[in-house]
């Protein structure tokens, strides 16, 4: 990976003897060397691979935004910027019951001609190591793959298009932890692009296009499969869905209307590009549902062939059960 590191620093958030969250500040920024470059490169890679990211933008009165602008202009040293940010993060984090301890990593860097600011509170875990004398001793390590209190600012996008609603991205975190809430409060930012909604609008547009084009059942299944495969490939590549690019891979309607023109003419409010949501696009090729002790998933092409639904009685009939399920059912009789 081509990465140019400008600044990186670590501070520690921990609880004192009174169970109060405090900040242990590092005395100075880390040196830019192979170790720190490798650390930031790994943080960048893992963040890109994380699913379920949210997007946002600064509020007009964001104090953090003012600090960031001063830091970028050179009137506020990066070290002081990191101290102010660490204190602000501690104050926000202390309001929540989970109040995680960890190592705060702040890094200003460039990757693929794009400037970024990374801010993340990483778990500090213990493991074992073998010394040169073949003894066993404890060692601390940063659990980068488990990080979920993280945000990244696309500085290039922010500085060239302040009207953008997505230059700030963050990991939403585990359900119930409200990670997104406090991190947005810390940055004094609002939720911007709603990726879940964009994916749902895309799915509806696909349904409507197929209906408007009067596709046969087999054509609808094939069309949805192509959309799913494109979206899934984008997810695997860490790339975004580009509506015009997607349209170029899909067949037009019998009247010659392509998918991109259809979404524009019908007023679907789709961004030019957005991250694909795995759970949403999966529904293009599968029926999925859970509740009341049931968890069902089957290929959409089976509906009407091996799986039948009666809406009047709300009954689902399956003809031909999977062998492993059939074996379990017959053994319990």
From Swiss-Prot:
Any GO molecular function: single-stranded RNA binding
Pfam families: NA37 (PF04245)
Subcellular location per the Swiss-Prot or TrEMBL entry: Cytoplasm, Nucleoid
InterPro entries the UniProt entry points to: Nucleoid_associated_NdpA
Keyword Cell membrane among record annotations: no
Gene Ontology CC annotation, any one: bacterial nucleoid
Main location: cytoplasm
Keywords: Cytoplasm
The UniProt record lists the keyword Transferase: no
Family stated for the protein in its record: Belongs to the YejK family.
Name this polypeptide is given: Nucleoid-associated protein VC_2039
Lineage: Bacteria, Pseudomonadati, Pseudomonadota, Gammaproteobacteria, Vibrionales
